[in-house]
Regions:
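Active-site-adjacent beta-strand/loop module that shapes the phosphate/pyrophosphate-binding cleft
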Residues: 66, 74-105, 109, 126-128
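Conserved N-terminal beta-strand and adjoining loop/helix that marks the start
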Residues: 1-22, 43, 74
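A generic structural micro-feature
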Residues: 3-7, 33-36, 80-85
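C-terminal structural segments of small proteins and small subunits
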Residues: 109-123
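A broad helix-preferring feature
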Residues: 9-12, 38, 89
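Conserved Nudix-box catalytic region and its N-terminal flanking loop in Nudix hydrolases
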Residues: 20-60
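Charged phosphate-binding loop/patch that engages nucleotide di/tri-phosphates or the phosphate backbone
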Residues: 120-135
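Short secondary-structure junctions
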Residues: 61-68
């Protein structure tokens, strides 16, 4: 990895519906965080707004169309390609009855404690669990 690699911005949709959150699992052969759980997201294209990228990536990965809302958290991390900045945004499905494409599924928020997310997701998971316990 080049120490002068440009920063890559990642947009993530944290899709919430009826006490559940949309979660998938990365492929075992993924370059970064293989086999780890994840929220849908990916790279922000040049000139693209982070919120639009989160919605686009969510649909591309899970088949779920979402309305993207407030930013939950921004995390810094390093991927195999260099430094990344991850923008996590709260989102809601346009259709609450939609079935996501594998490997994504609806998971009760309290079950997030059983998941194995990359470290950059820890603050978002903590907040979701705290909000769930607060009612």
């Amino acid at each position: 990895m080049n120490q002068h690699s440009p920063l890559t911005v990642i947009a993530v949709a944290v899709v919430l519906s009826a006490g559940s959150v949309l979660v998938g699992r990365r492929r075992d052969d993924a370059a970064d965080a293989p086999g780890r759980d994840e929220f849908p997201g990916g790279k922000v294209e040049a000139g693209e707004a982070v919120e639009l990228a989160a919605a686009r990536e969510c649909f591309e990965e899970s088949g779920v169309t979402v309305n993207v809302g407030q930013r939950l958290h921004v995390a810094q991390a390093t991927s195999s390609a260099g430094p990344i900045e991850i923008h996590f945004h709260r989102a809601a499905p346009v259709d609450a009855n939609v079935s996501p494409l594998p490997p994504f599924t609806w998971l009760k928020i309290e079950n997030l404690t059983r998941c194995h997310f990359p470290p950059a997701n820890a603050e978002v998971v903590r907040r979701l669990l705290a909000d769930e316990h607060a009612g």
